A protein has these predicted regions:
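Extreme N-terminal tail/first-helix region
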Residues: 1-22
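Hydrophobic residues on conserved beta-strands that form the core of alpha/beta folds
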Residues: 14, 28, 41-43, 67, ...
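Acidic, metal-coordinating catalytic segment for phosphate/diphosphate chemistry
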Residues: 16-54, 60
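Short beta-strand micro-motifs in enzyme catalytic cores
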Residues: 27-31, 77, 127-129, 151
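Unchanged
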Residues: 42, 52-54, 59, 85-173
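A glycine-rich, hydrophobic loop/mini-helix early in the fold
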Residues: 49-76, 80
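Charged phosphate-binding loop/patch that engages nucleotide di/tri-phosphates or the phosphate backbone
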Residues: 174-186
């Protein structure tokens, strides 16, 4: 087993924090921080987000479930794996199961925690928890949030790998667990 290399040896000291704005999905703050060598940075900006989940979901016949939806940050419609925010009081697994059902109508199967990533450890406080589930079945229609418009489709795994290799799955926090899946790090 690999030794844990993440530690607090060079931890910065937060001298003060000022919240610039707070919204349900994003909070921004300005910290005054002291570095280990004693230098002070009077303006270090941190984005506080809730933790997220995403799901690599395979049907009983081995096809992958993808969604396509418009993403305003890129100004494009993108392929994605099911994903969403962990609601207060939920575990990552509970959130992953809920998001898969809400976005696709699929449920069940054998669930496995796949990987956990930081979107940007330099400026963001949250983590993304990825799951792999095999053997899911369609049990209902979608139950989308007001701003969601997700086109769900099932694809052979080879096609999803081709999408990934050709930069058609752009979200890094979705691409990383897919690369892990396809390159045998199961």
């Amino acid at each position: 087993m690999m030794k844990n290399t993440i530690d607090n040896e060079k931890k910065w000291k937060v001298l003060s924090s000022e919240y610039l704005f707070r919204r349900p999905w994003l909070t921004a703050r300005k910290d005054v921080v002291q570095l280990p060598d004693g230098r002070v940075n009077p303006e270090y900006y941190i984005l506080e987000y809730p933790d997220w989940v995403n799901v690599i979901a395979l049907t009983k016949d081995g096809r992958m479930i993808l969604g396509r939806q418009y993403r305003p940050g890129l100004g494009n419609t993108c392929y994605e794996i099911p994903c969403g925010v962990i609601e207060e009081g939920e575990t990552p697994l509970e959130a992953a199961k809920r998001e898969l059902l809400e976005e696709t109508g699929y449920a069940g199967g054998d669930w496995r925690e796949w990987m956990t990533l930081s979107p940007n450890p330099s400026t963001s406080t949250n983590l993304t928890h990825s799951f792999l589930v095999t053997g899911v079945e369609k049990i209902s229609g979608q139950h989308l949030d007001a701003t969601e418009d997700i086109e769900v489709s099932l694809h052979p795994q080879e096609y999803v790998l081709e999408l990934l290799q050709n930069n058609q799955i752009l979200q890094a926090l979705m691409a990383a667990p897919l690369w892990k899946y396809f390159y045998g790090l199961k």
